[in-house]
């Protein structure tokens, strides 16, 4: 059993990551699964806004669950979707998308597989 209690075994603080307008807290799943999965709490950096760049992620699995605040993503062929507390989303591998905007109090959980993956900027659809 791996237990992320925030008291020292796992990272109990937020750090920078993929996007400059977010902070990330590693929940220890990457280490516990030897890189097969990653789970992070992601929160907005107040005053920093999304850079709505179209991109894809090269991974097998990506899901988000909104804890507080809201976030709007735009997905190719589906348009804009706003996620609010309690919303969960499974993003299919390789779907072209971009974050449009988010609230300053946004906090979500993201689970990916594998833990490390490539993000590629792509042309607008």
Question: Where on the chain are the PLM-derived regions?
Answer:
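Short beta-strand segments in beta-sandwich/barrel cores
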Residues: 50, 69-74, 88-89
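Short acidic-glycine-tyrosine-enriched beta hairpin
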Residues: 77-94
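A short, N-terminal "cap"/entry segment at the start of jelly-roll beta-barrel domains
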Residues: 1-46, 120-125
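Short, surface-exposed secondary-structure boundary micro-motifs
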Residues: 94-95, 100
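A short beta-loop-beta micro-motif enriched in histidine and acidic residues
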Residues: 19, 32-37, 47-63, 77, ...
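Short, conserved beta-strand element in jelly-roll/cupin
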Residues: 41-46, 56-73, 111-114
